Every structure is written in structure tokens, then in C-alpha cells.
Amino acid sequence: MKRIALCVLICLLALVIAQPAQTQAGFMPAVMQDTKLDDLKREAAGEVDKLQTFTQQMVDQVFSFSELGFHEYETTKYLTGALEKQGFKVERSVAGMPTAWMATYGSGKPVIAFITDIDCIPRASQKPGVAYHDPIVADAPGHGEGHNSGMAVNITAAVVLKRLMEKNKIGGTIKILPGVAEELVGAKAFFIRAGLFKDVDIVLGCHVDSDFAVNWGQPERNSGLVSVQYSFHGKAAHAAGAPWSGRSALDAVELMNAGWNYRREHLRLQQRSHYVISDGGDQPNVVPSEATVWYYFRELDYPHIKELYELGNKMAQAATMMTDTT
């Protein structure tokens, strides 16, 4: 029921936004009476209710694909096919990404965009309806963050909005875009760079919440982030025969991580930062000449994100000085 309520909410937000739009000849006047808007809200709720099976099928189907970022091929094929059947025009491989797409309907202002994520996370395979860890395939990826549900909600809301626009001759444009590789901080930045939001008046998105709760308008619960890979370069040597001849890039990685962890106590409570060592060398008896650590720096706004990023850069530079690496 909460998923259906969210579909209604998103659709109604779009209707309210569309209300003051300048319209074409023969379309509804720019300012609708409150009673007319109330009628549209009730009609939207009824249409969403009729699409419960359609919505649930999308949720389950995307869950079954469970594709990692930039590899959402089956998910993309399924979702774009569903949108084309509903009368949307689909442009594929947008912004230079094979699994990215943009579906559109209508013309003119306002331009309302729907966006939500579609990728999954590693090692999160899980049988549906089971309240304990029980993977479908051991160590396989899965939708551990609920990205199988958001696009179903957005598409349902967009389909209902399209039907009401057609029936009531409401002008405007609907856009639907997928959050490709959101877990890797992927598509949205590339969409912006490609200019896909230049004509957009507002973007509406949704994401499943903890315990299937529904909330909105709480920016303090959400953060932006910068993804950074720090690659250190040292000098290889035999770790037993002549370690003094080497300069360990892995030592630099470990010192950077140690420095960052000591600094955590003195960072804002709102920040989140995490890392993995994505390259720690080849084998223990060789001093690693190359090593890489991958960081995410999260904060509530850009200035604070930038502060974390610049602090990370200082930690990396200090690590190179201590280890005579670059």
C-alpha cells in the first residue's frame, strides 16, 4: 500500500506543477480551479490503483535481473519496452552510456523529469520474501538497496500523468531517466554534462526507505558525495632479499587510511566516509610498486563535500612524503 501511496504522491506533485503551465490552443486554461485539481487528484489515485499489478510486476522483474552499475542491460531492455508500450518515445544509449536512456511524452512547458536508480550492489543476492540472508546465487549481486522498486513507482506515476494529460488536454512534457550505476556515482553527473536537464523545470525522484517508510522533503536525510581513487606509485623490490631498495605504495595507502581514521573524531557528525583498497599489490614477497585506495566522501552540501575531498588530498600527499612515493 505504501508503494501505491508513493505513486499517487509523485503523480499529484507533477499535476500541481503542471497546473500553471502555459497551454496550447484547445488545452486547459493556465490556472485551473481548485475543484478541478481536486478532481484530477482523485482520478489519479484511481488510475494508480488500477495499475497495482503492472507496478508489482515491474518491481519483481527488475529484482530478478539484479544487474550491477553500467551493466543494467536486461533491466534497460525491459523498462524501455514497457514505456514504449505505454506510448513513450525512448532514446537509448544517452550521455555516452549503453544502459542509459530517456523516455519522453508531450511537448512544451512545464518539463517534468522523473529519475530513480536501477542498479544493484555486489554480493547481495537474496530470495524475495525471506527475512534472513538466503541468496538465490551465493556471492551474486542483488538489490540490497531497493533499486528494483523506484523505477516501477516512477513509471506508474508517469503513465498515470500521461493519461490525465491526454484526457484533460493538459500541456507539458514528461521525461523519465534511469539512475544508471548510482552505486558508483554514475549517470546523473553524465546526464547533466550532456545537457539532458537544461529544459527541465523540476525533477521528481523516489527511493525506498528503511522499513518501507514513506517520507519526503527531508534534505537532512540525504547527502551528496565525491568518489575518488588515490593511486600511489613506489618502487618494486624483493621483500626478503632487498626490501630497503623498494618504496611501498601499499605503505602509502595504509598510512593515508590510518590518518583518515584518526581524523574521523574531528569531522562533522553529518559526514560519512568509507574506503576499500582496490589494489594492494601482487604478492607478499614483492614490495608493491602500485597501490590504490578508493574513497567516498559524503556530506549534506557541496562546500562540506569539497572540504572532505581537499582533506583527503592532504592525507594522500602526507602519505607520499612519509613513504617516498608519489
Segments from the language model and where they lie:
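Bacterial N-terminal signal peptides
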Residues: 7-16
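A conserved active-site cap/scaffold subdomain adjacent to cofactor or substrate pockets
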Residues: 286-312
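Structural recognition of the beta-strand scaffold that forms the well-ordered cores
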Residues: 61, 91, 111-115, 175-178, ...
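Acidic/His- and Gly-rich active-site-bordering loop/insert found
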Residues: 26-143, 152-172
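Positively charged n-region of N-terminal signal peptides that target proteins for export
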Residues: 1-4
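Histidine/acidic-residue-rich, glycine-tolerant segments that coordinate divalent metal ions
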Residues: 133-142, 148-149, 165-288, 298
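Signal peptide processing junction and immediate N-terminal pro/mature segment
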Residues: 19-27
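A common structural junction motif
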Residues: 118-121, 263-264, 313-323
